Amino acid sequence: MNTAPTTDNNAVRKHDVRPELFVDGYEVVIGIEIHCQLNTESKIFSSAPTDFGHEPNTQASIVDLGLPGVLPVLNAGVVDRALKFGIGVNAELGLFNTFDRKNYFYPDLPKGYQITQMANPIVGEGYIDVVVNEGEKNEYPKRMGITRAHLEEDAGKSVHDAVDGMTGVDLNRAGTPLIEIVSEPDMRSAHEALAYIKAIHQLVTWLGISDAIMAEGSFRCDCNVSIRKPGAELGTRTELKNLNSFRFIERAINREIERQIDILEDGGKVVQATMLYDPERDETRVMRTKEDANDYRYFPDPDLLPVRIEQLTVDSIRAAMPELPVARRARFEEALGLSEYDARILTGSRQIADYFEDVVAEIDQQDAKMAANWVMGDLLGALNKDDKDIIDSPISAKQLAGMLARIKDDTLSGKLAKKVFGALYERAGGDADDAADKIIEEKGLKQETDTGAIKAIVEEVIAKNTAMVEEYRGGKEKAFNGLVGQVMKASRGSANPQQVNQILKELLD
């Protein structure tokens, strides 16, 4: 490792003991291994495609099948993506890295070994800063250490439900490039573990190096869990394997913590084991114990030369890196005046952040808070309801900005803007950037701002609602709101609310 991280990471090893995170008097210690598939078009050592969802054994080459006489050739795109990740987590980079063979037998591993990086990984020590949410109004920042991240090839997949009574092997996934990310044992609760996993997931998608679709197996997590009394030596750890949803990760860790506490409280000992989580029964159970563990007998792969990376290559990749989530979040707070919460939501994905900035670019920067409210509330709410991503938004950034401009110049009230937004979402204005203006014109949604016209409506409402007027003059403030509502109803929501309030007060007081 000979490329230093850009920021000091001495804080990685330091832990603030948080007694509020103890469970029944035990401190929880968690370390995490993440297997993330890299989104290259071809596999790490062959030209076979990496597409997901094809018929079994149609995406495997002779290299992936481990046929005699074939040699692996390293995919340069895999190296570039790994370097991006290393830069993104402030890590030391292995400008000299090598590949090793991890030897074990399993039906979905045709060569009888997996090519990985044991001795000299491409990414060394680094860290990632996260925000941990331990419940309502209980958030805190924490720096999580990363031990290393190394390249390796994925294995195939055993298929248990294709033929009754038999297990098949699908080698489409064999040879798909992986980066395995190994954390320090820095997490002290399931919430902290989940915050770390989500931060890594956000980073790899933000950098564009992985689609990280957990349901497709392109982002898989193994969690090492142990417990101890405060100040004691580390306890015996167990490993929760192949957790593939955020919801199950948190539940599985909590169930395993409870299981280990029950064992120790009953006077027993936790046995080092690989665990499975059963979501239907909401429990963890032993898959195999330490005695069953493999001796992988690592040794250097003789078919692959060491990888030597020029510093110029690293500098070029670093220069082309997008602004990272933490930096963008800070800029949204400092330059645009957004709250920490708003900035965090708007940097939840690179696509959301880009969309928001595209909206702000079309309006006055001072109105960034208004844009944030519409993007976070109305737009993301509608998209989530329809199970869509921001890239599938039926409203373009320029169209939303056009609607916000009409709010700003008083063409639209907030209530009318909701109607225009709904029409935009249903694509009533088509693809044109000025779709909001077309909808306002066609549907007659322009706000009434003529003082004389509004005053006439107010006078008519006062004349028809004498009882409510007397209640207001008698000191019942709620009656005033009732009169405002009657004016808005009479104007079909088009009257400017501020002018309605002003004129109504002038006529009643």
Swiss-Prot record:
A Pfam family (short name) is GatB_Yqey
Give the catalytic activity: L-glutamyl-tRNA(Gln) + L-glutamine + ATP + H2O = L-glutaminyl-tRNA(Gln) + L-glutamate + ADP + phosphate + H(+); L-aspartyl-tRNA(Asn) + L-glutamine + ATP + H2O = L-asparaginyl-tRNA(Asn) + L-glutamate + ADP + phosphate + 2 H(+)
List the Gene Ontology MF annotations in alphabetical order.
asparaginyl-tRNA synthase (glutamine-hydrolyzing) activity; ATP binding; glutaminyl-tRNA synthase (glutamine-hydrolyzing) activity
For this UniProt record, give its keywords in alphabetical order, as a comma-separated list: ATP-binding, Ligase, Nucleotide-binding, Protein biosynthesis
- GO biological process: one example: translation
Per the UniProt entry, the Enzyme Commission number(s) are 6.3.5.-
UniProt cross-references to HAMAP family, sorted A to Z: GatB
Give the record's family classification: Belongs to the GatB/GatE family. GatB subfamily.
Subunit: Heterotrimer of A, B and C subunits.
Role according to the record: Allows the formation of correctly charged Asn-tRNA(Asn) or Gln-tRNA(Gln) through the transamidation of misacylated Asp-tRNA(Asn) or Glu-tRNA(Gln) in organisms which lack either or both of asparaginyl-tRNA or glutaminyl-tRNA synthetases. The reaction takes place in the presence of glutamine and ATP through an activated phospho-Asp-tRNA(Asn) or phospho-Glu-tRNA(Gln).
Query: What is the protein name for this chain?
Result: Aspartyl/glutamyl-tRNA(Asn/Gln) amidotransferase subunit B
